């Protein structure tokens, strides 16, 4: 926003005095920074008042969804998600950056290949999506260590505090990632409009300064020093007011908070507990940050699912379309202006990046599934709300009132919250007073309008609010100069075209609705039956009532066409911005929104653009689909769908119609059980001939871990030796006295971890894991040992990831992995000399392409056999379906031809493991570099996505697996197969294979 010179002089004068600047433009209070350099940049690009953000001087509501690039590291597929978000009517995506993936070794920042953020930013720009950058350094995110690299366990200072050792440890990462973000912020023509320093900085232990203004200011200064000039926003984990503007040092520019009102009990997806619907957020906002727009930086879009949980299908049921209607519209009642849903797309926890309490899938029950499908009804419901927000600018300038059970509705069973506008229209959010009610309630409304106070319906009958539903009724809604005095049906969108205006309204099945329009024109039904439609003309308006039908009706009132739809029909409509200069829709601006067209096209419409006399649509189809286009510019004569010229007809209302045929491809998937499987023992460490001379010695007398002191003669904490991820192996050498009868050990691997112990080649036993246990103390009986003879104890520990660091001062991220105690407890027992290993090289990890977390310490991993084309020619022939006959770990490999048609079909293939004979396994698909943990006694997910972008997708695929048998009887997979969902004819285009180097003999591998 540009200021007059007089205003600028006043600002500079106040700035010189160190004051915060406030001024009024067009009746709104704007807040400017006291820092002149920052203010100079922001005044043109991103500013705000107490109502909303302004981008380039234009008021805008930020409607956003969370999506993490590291959970879908394929550029073209990132564009796919951005386009699906754009199609919702959203204009923004929020993203985390996982520090652990880009600085696996202190001082070495590597953000290339799949970890390069710039293609992610470019894809956002191509889709016309703004970005909210959230690089941490702490992110939580159900990620290992909350995004902290494992080497922070050695930092001599409290994490997320002003301790110098911790701050110094963050400098390299933040300076690099913030500089990249600065390069792509809006001031440089990029998509990034907001920056969040820290994450959920909300709770601290007693004895620790919290909140620490010095710490928070340091994190903010790190970003500013790297060139970040866009506004800083925070996300208090609850509406507590921490670091809000005006709180002093460490205050952010815009205060935001999180909210997950239904919690995470997916096991009871139909239960909405009493009292969980927020009702005081507006009051808290006015108390905590009245000068900034109301922001919820994380509002519940799904749920995580723990080991043994009911699965993400249940989570998507708990947080379904009904939840969205009730809870998201409730947020609108608070005049939310920055709303980000966590998650919009969850993705996958590739290669050990997840935290201990979760598994491979991070589907999150979100609107877009892990396999990138948009078949959940909650996606379509979001589209209705997102598009309504785009065409309701008066919402942002209205004045929210208090909720009430009297004054608007004629029954106390309903609660109404008004947002009253002057000349910009008003909004009335209606819900059940018992928000979880599944009853249908009949009601009438009395609403203030420009035509006076009106009792609705005027033409007789009643309105209906069905169970677990909510509505936003509008009054004096401006449809490009036509005043909608009121509408009880909800607004999907409206547009002004050269030949008139179009308004799209929808209602639920079985409902009756009514609207009134300021006009002297008559009502004409121009499509569909007149049955169930009534109207009445007054001196200055016309009132229309109708019963919702599954068949579309169109009525004409003057130059306004009104489409009357049921909700399920409205799901099939899309409102793409119409590009006239190139193919990209561009960012959402009032001009771009106004230029949109309306398309009925089923599964997905990605983009629309004009080129010469052609109207080009890019769209996805999962069935033969009738396509209709409303508002085609007069310059367009031909229709192209996905690049193909498509014949079309034009009806009397100017609607273009065409049909896209869908022919399901003939897909023949190979039978995995019939492949020529090769096997290699991946636990050679228990063989008598095994040489561990190259292993690091666990000989540190002290630990650098400040959370837990040593209870062993030397440190057996893996992070002290640079091993932070995946399987850990220990070999303890001792010379027997002959008195030893038992071996006691306490292993730590995180929630649901497992461990196994051998003496030489003799299996002693295993801990198969429980969700509630992150460590386990076991005592194993020993056979009679021969005095003077050397023995080796081999311990395998499944490291499930590092703990998150939610509460400042607890330093739970430093919870060690490995062995906390071990001994031969008998009186004259010999001491044990330990060696250990994790991934080859530890922090000097071997595979720079796949990153520092991808590999663990199993023999096959250290050798690189999990990579494509391992040297399996001379391996034993054996299948994971045959498995192991005794406790151990095997690695299985097979190749096959995957011949998929290259006709634009997206197949969303998956690997499905349906059952296990024995309790635990791990498997790895080398083509996707996914590590999955499947535990029989707390198994939740048994399907793994195979996204496009995998190398050699249409030629040789390689599947590798490490079944871990924690039972003396061995173990095997009961079933292993490839499957696919309904193929989608997609306009996404070619997906380039990400770099996946093949096997190469590793120097120094042991």
Swiss-Prot record:
Glycans are attached at residues 156, 373, 402, 422, 478, 522, 622, 739, 760, 777, 805. Pfam families: BetaGal_ABD2, BetaGal_dom2, BetaGal_dom3, Glyco_hydro_35. The keyword Hydrolase applies. The active site is at residues 200, 298. It catalyses: Hydrolysis of terminal non-reducing beta-D-galactose residues in beta-D-galactosides. Keywords: Glycoprotein, Glycosidase, Hydrolase, Pharmaceutical, Signal. Residues 1-19 form the signal peptide. It comes from the Eukaryota. GO terms for molecular function: beta-galactosidase activity. Its EC number is 3.2.1.23. Cleaves beta-linked terminal galactosyl residues from gangliosides, glycoproteins, and glycosaminoglycans. Belongs to the glycosyl hydrolase 35 family. This is Beta-galactosidase. The lineage of its organism: Eukaryota, Fungi, Dikarya, Ascomycota, Pezizomycotina.
């Amino acid at each position: 926003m540009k200021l007059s010179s007089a205003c600028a002089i006043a600002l500079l004068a106040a700035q010189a005095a160190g004051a915060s600047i406030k001024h009024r433009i067009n009746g709104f209070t704007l807040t400017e920074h006291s820092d002149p350099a920052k203010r100079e940049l922001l005044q043109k690009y991103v500013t705000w008042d107490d109502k909303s953000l302004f981008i380039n001087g234009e008021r805008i509501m930020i409607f956003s969804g969370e999506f993490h690039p590291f959970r879908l590291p394929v550029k073209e597929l990132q564009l796919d998600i951005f386009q699906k978000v754009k199609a919702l009517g959203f204009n923004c995506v929020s993203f985390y950056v996982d520090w652990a993936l880009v600085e696996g070794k202190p001082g070495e920042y590597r953000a290339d290949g799949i970890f390069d953020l710039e293609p992610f930013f470019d894809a956002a720009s191509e889709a016309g999506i703004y970005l909210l950058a959230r690089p941490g350094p702490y992110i939580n995110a159900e990620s290992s260590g909350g995004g902290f690299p494992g080497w922070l366990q050695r930092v001599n200072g409290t994490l997320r505090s002003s301790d110098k050792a911790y701050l110094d440890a963050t400098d390299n990462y933040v300076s690099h990632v913030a500089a990249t973000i600065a390069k792509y912020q809006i001031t440089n023509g990029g998509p990034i409009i907001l920056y969040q320093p820290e994450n959920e900085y909300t709770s601290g232990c007693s004895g620790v300064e919290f909140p620490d203004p010095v710490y928070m200011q340091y994190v903010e200064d790190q970003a500013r020093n790297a060139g970040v000039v866009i506004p800083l926003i925070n996300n208090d984990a609850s509406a507590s007011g921490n670091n809000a503007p005006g709180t002093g040092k460490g205050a952010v520019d815009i205060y935001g908070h999180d909210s997950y009102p239904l919690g995470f009990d997916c096991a009871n997806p139909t239960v909405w507990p009493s009292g969980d619907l927020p009702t005081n957020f507006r009051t808290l906002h006015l108390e905590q940050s009245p000068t900034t727009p109301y922001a919820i930086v994380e509002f519940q879009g799904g749920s995580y699912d723990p080991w043994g949980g009911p699965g993400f299908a249940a989570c998507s049921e708990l947080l379904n379309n009904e939840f969205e209607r009730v809870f998201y519209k409730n947020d609108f009642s608070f005049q939310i202006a920055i709303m980000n849903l966590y998650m919009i797309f969850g993705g996958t926890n590739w290669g050990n990046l997840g935290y201990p309490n979760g598994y491979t899938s991070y589907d999150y029950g979100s609107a877009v599934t892990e396999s990138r499908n948009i078949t959940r009804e909650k996606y379509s419901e979001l589209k209705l709300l997102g598009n309504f927000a785009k065409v309701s600018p008066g919402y942002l300038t209205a004045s929210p009132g208090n909720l009430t059970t009297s004054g608007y509705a004629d029954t106390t069973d309903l609660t109404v919250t008004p947002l009253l506008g002057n000349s910009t229209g008003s909004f009335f959010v209606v819900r059940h007073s018992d928000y979880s009610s599944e009853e249908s309630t009949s009601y009438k409304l009395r609403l203030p309008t420009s035509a006076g106070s009106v009792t609705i319906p005027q033409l007789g009958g009643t309105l209906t609010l069905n169970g677990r539903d909510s509505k936003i009724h509008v009054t004096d809604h401006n449809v490009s100069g036509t005043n909608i005095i009121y509408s009880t049906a909800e607004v999907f969108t409206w547009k002004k075209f050269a030949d008139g205006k179009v308004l799209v309204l929808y209602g639920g099945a079985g409902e009756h609705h009514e609207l009134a329009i300021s006009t002297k024109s008559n009502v004409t039904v121009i499509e569909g039956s007149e049955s169930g439609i009534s109207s009445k003309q007054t001196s200055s308006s016309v009132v229309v009532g109708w019963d919702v039908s599954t068949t579309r009706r169109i009525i004409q009132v003057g130059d306004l066409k009104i489409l009357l739809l049921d909700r399920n029909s409205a799901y099939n409509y899309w409102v793409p911005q119409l590009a006239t200069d190139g193919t990209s829709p561009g960012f959402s601006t009032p001009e771009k929104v106004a230029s949109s067209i309306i398309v009925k096209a089923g599964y997905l419409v990605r983009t629309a653009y004009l080129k010469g006399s052609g109207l080009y649509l890019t769209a996805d189809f999962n069935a033969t689909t009738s396509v209709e286009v409303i508002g085609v510019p007069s310059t367009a004569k031909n229709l192209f769908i996905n690049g193909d010229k498509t014949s079309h007809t034009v009806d009397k209302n100017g609607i273009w119609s065409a049909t896209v045929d869908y022919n399901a491809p003939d897909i023949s998937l190979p039978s995995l059980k019939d492949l020529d499987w090769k096997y290699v023992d991946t636990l050679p460490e228990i063989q008598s001939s095994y040489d561990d001379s190259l292993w690091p010695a666990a000989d540190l007398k002290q630990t650098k871990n400040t959370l837990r002191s040593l209870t062993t003669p030397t440190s057996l904490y893996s992070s002290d030796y640079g091993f932070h991820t995946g399987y850990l192996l220990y070999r303890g050498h001792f010379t027997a006295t002959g008195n030893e009868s038992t071996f006691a050990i306490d292993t730590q691997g995180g929630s649901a971890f497992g461990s196994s112990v051998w003496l030489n080649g003799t299996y002693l036993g295993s801990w198969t894991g429980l969700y509630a246990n992150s460590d386990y103390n076991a005592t194993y009986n020993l056979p009679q040992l021969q005095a003077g003879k050397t023995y080796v104890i081999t311990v395998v520990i499944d490291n499930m990831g590092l703990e998150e660091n939610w509460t400042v001062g607890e330093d739970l991220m430093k919870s060690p992995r490995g062995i906390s105690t071990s001994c031969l407890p008998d009186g004259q027992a010999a001491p044990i000399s330990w060696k250990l290993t994790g991934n080859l090289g530890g922090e000097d990890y071997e595979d720079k392409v796949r990153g520092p977390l991808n590999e663990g310490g199993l023999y096959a991993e250290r050798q690189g056999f999990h990579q494509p084309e391992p040297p399996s020619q001379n391996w034993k022939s054996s299948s994971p379906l045959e498995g192991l006959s005794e406790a151990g770990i095997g690695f299985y490999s097979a190749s096959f031809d995957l011949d998929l048609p290259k006709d634009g079909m997206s197949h969303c293939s998956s690997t499905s493991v349906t059952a296990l004979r024995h309790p635990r396994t791990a498997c790895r698909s080398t083509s996707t570099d996914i590590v999955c943990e499947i535990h029989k006694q707390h198994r939740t997910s048994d399907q793994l996505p195979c996204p496009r972008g995998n190398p050699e997708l249409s030629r040789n695929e390689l599947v590798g697996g490490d079944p871990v048998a924690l039972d003396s009887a061995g173990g095997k997979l009961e079933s292993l197969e490839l499957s696919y969902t309904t193929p989608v004819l997609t306009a996404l285009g070619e997906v380039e294979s990400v770099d996946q180097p093949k096997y190469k003999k590793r120097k120094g591998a042991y």
